[in-house]
Amino acid sequence: MANRNLEKLASIDAQLRLLVPGKVSEDDKLIEYDALLLDKFLDILQDLHGEDLKEAVQECYELSAEYEGKHDPKKLEELGSVLTSLDPGDSIVIAKAFSHMLNLANLAEEVQIAYRRRIKLKRGDFADEANATTESDIEETFKKLVLKLNKSPEEVFDALKNQTVDLVLTAHPTQSVRRSLLQKHGRIRNCLAQLYAKDITPDDKQELDEALHREIQAAFRTDEIRRTPPTPQDEMRAGMSYFHETIWKGVPKFLRRVDTALKNIGINERVPYNAPLIQFSSWMGGDRDGKHPRVTPEVTRDVCLLARMMASNMYFSQIEDLMFEMSMWRCNSELRVRAEELYRTARRDVKHYIEFWKQVPPTEPYRVILGDVRDKLYNTRERSRHLLAHGISDIPEEAVYTNVEQFLEPLELCYRSLCDCGDRVIADGSLLDFLRQVSTFGLSLVKLDIRQESDRHTDVLDAITQHLEIGSYREWSEEKRQEWLLAELSGKRPLFGSDLPKTEEVKDVLDTFNVLAELPSDCFGAYIISMATSPSDVLAVELLQRECHVKHPLRVVPLFEKLADLEAAPAAMARLFSIDWYRNRIDGKQEVMIGYSDSGKDAGRFSAAWQLYKAQEEIIKVAKEFGVKLVIFHGRGGTVGRGGGPTHLAILSQPPDTIHGSLRVTVQGEVIEQSFGEEHLCFRTLQRFCAATLEHGMNPPISPRPEWRELMDQMAVVATEEYRSIVFKEPRFVEYFRLATPELEYGRMNIGSRPSKRKPSGGIESLRAIPWIFAWTQTRFHLPVWLGFGAAFKHAIKKDSKNLQMLQEMYKTWPFFRVTIDLVEMVFAKGDPGIAALNDKLLVSEDLWPFGESLRANYEETKDYLLKIAGHRDLLEGDPYLKQRIRLRDSYITTLNVCQAYTLKRIRDPNYHVTLRPHISKEYAAEPSKPADELIHLNPTSEYAPGLEDTLILTMKGIAAGMQNTG
């Protein structure tokens, strides 16, 4: 297959180069990278499983490729016959092989993107901001602002110093690849990048070839399937591993690049080390969101202590290197006095240190100071470890750092002293990097947000009011709730004592507040209230924080998710800001979170995107009226259906005046790996967030014209009606959805700790947004993304033919509208209604077939309208790179789609019989064995026929890798 596949890839490449002459450059190496990895893998497959199995993989690939050429459904049935004739062990190996090939295609693509970026930088090209595959780096953005937009370098520097990007890592269950495999993928990526480096010697090449072979084989031999669901502590450790591996060193490296870029526009100052350019927060271990049974108060406590221990350990691991560097004897008098005092009071020898274990003499004053810092870091780490393991520690608080100011003070003293003595160049080396790390990560590494549903707070307050015999808080009107809450907040008496009767749920909420009171305040960020609808939801949390003695109360952030909540959000915030007590409490600063996932599930992507846009404008307007600086926290997922898309485009298409140098955004699931999995990815992520935030503030996008707004409002009404009439009102829809997609089987992937439903029973409403999008992504039908668009466009153009011209103008000149259309176009390029039709034929009862056909007709009509508005003849004609990447993976994904459909048929229909051919895989083993039995033994408790469950899960993971989205 290798040679034939190489020819096929080369022919696709040639077609793509002809498609848009001059657009896919001659130095593009994606095909070469892809073919190299595929060649290696197929050799490994033959070595491990024999020629016959490799031939079966080849046959499947070629049938898929033939289908991709003509979209003849008979080819899918032929492919289905081949796949269903395999015995259970062979079926697992083939599903695993195609899943593995898609992961390799992703790695080839990542290396190619990095390669193309380096070439562009060498040429000094400006990025094409309208293109979904490119983005400006920080230097390009500075130059663009100064040279093209006539901003002064000082204005740029001033805006930069005062901006903040807070990236919030969440444990949303969308990372379908195990950490064991992610690490191997990282090593494959590195080998591939080094193999194509210039000046590589023959010996280096040979060793890299061997390493590449080893890592590809190791990845293939690793079980892709998580056999048990992760706990919140597992998720937190997985999230924290990115800090250890890339983010920790990536931040100072990125800030140095910012310094260099500033120099290149004439600013001879560095970004101050305490400028809050980048911050990190987390939801891992803090995200309850209603009934998440595994996130308990104890888990929250453990996660905070673990993060604290990790932070002090990472500082501790660097401090001796810094002591080696700080060998200077000249210092200012302030530092000398401190060093002599420490020398007199310090212990003599410290034998548990590797370096500088003997007492440092006062002639090396910086080392004396840093030695004391080292002692305190050691104690800080050990105290966190004791508290984590035993709940108590004999290390007193005086011997540790309890807040970041204590930690920064001696480091700042060293920095000032070096500058005073003419050694600024030394101060601006590793010491500056260390100071920047301390300012960014503090003592807690990340700040943990707590998220809880508003109903859970209502339960607690209802228990309190019933116990006090003053009525039922739950049944009170909003006015009465506010009146009582404000009276209690203004008073000083405690509301309840230890005699308060507590259900398990009430105890859980109160114990969480007790953890907030117990741990250092710098462990925590925001307290987010999901399903927030009224001011009392916010005041309730303020009161509970006070009652549980939280010394430094967390800022309270309402989260508006559904369409009606987004529409009501500006009025709710105005009511909240009009309360004197609350305005005094917030000191002119407020954060509001908007949810992209649930709003999309509630009303469809078109209406959700437009309502999110309008809600931001309105909330900002309300905040300005009350003199409040508002930060909008964007709860975006990775997929387009959950608000995802290229970062720079997403930021630059936000309404003007809504970011103003403060951006807070979630980084979820698989997006964490795509953003921080490698050093260069981390660097690029920090650049794109900072650059786009700066550009949005200094060069805001245009506001839509009144006639555009009017048209959008009309279309949104039609889009919502169309979406809801099908998803919520059509009686056949729920049955069709459950039959046509693997939604019911989603939970078997074990990719997250939380349940896939908010309520155990219930329909689409109770299903979380992630499995909702995941299920449609698997069938390549993507219904939640496009449903409603076609009806909206059809209505607008039928009403007045001039509206087509207006929509085309909106696409050309309004970033928000262009990004919305481009992202849906990208999803159509990844879609294939032929796969959905196959699923219908195999899995859906015949009486529902006409319903499926009507949805597919809607899909095609929507696609046609989309192309008309974008002025494109074909999907992605303006983005050949993306088209190239999608085309390369289509044949792999199609095989997995067909395998999934037939596997689901075998699982769900006991009367569906297949004829199996003899086992074709050979396997090396110490003793003769049946490899099928070995593979099936990995899942001995499956309720299905042998091998079917693992085959199904492998197809899900492979399709997720191929679509580059799970949920």
Curated annotation (Swiss-Prot):
SUPFAM superfamilies: Phosphoenolpyruvate/pyruvate domain (SSF51621). Its main location: cytoplasm. It is found in: Cytoplasm. It catalyses: oxaloacetate + phosphate = phosphoenolpyruvate + hydrogencarbonate. Gene3D superfamilies: Phosphoenolpyruvate/pyruvate domain. The modification Phosphoserine is found at S11. It comes from the Eukaryota. The active site is at H172, K601. Through the carboxylation of phosphoenolpyruvate (PEP) it forms oxaloacetate, a four-carbon dicarboxylic acid source for the tricarboxylic acid cycle. Belongs to the PEPCase type 1 family. This is Phosphoenolpyruvate carboxylase.
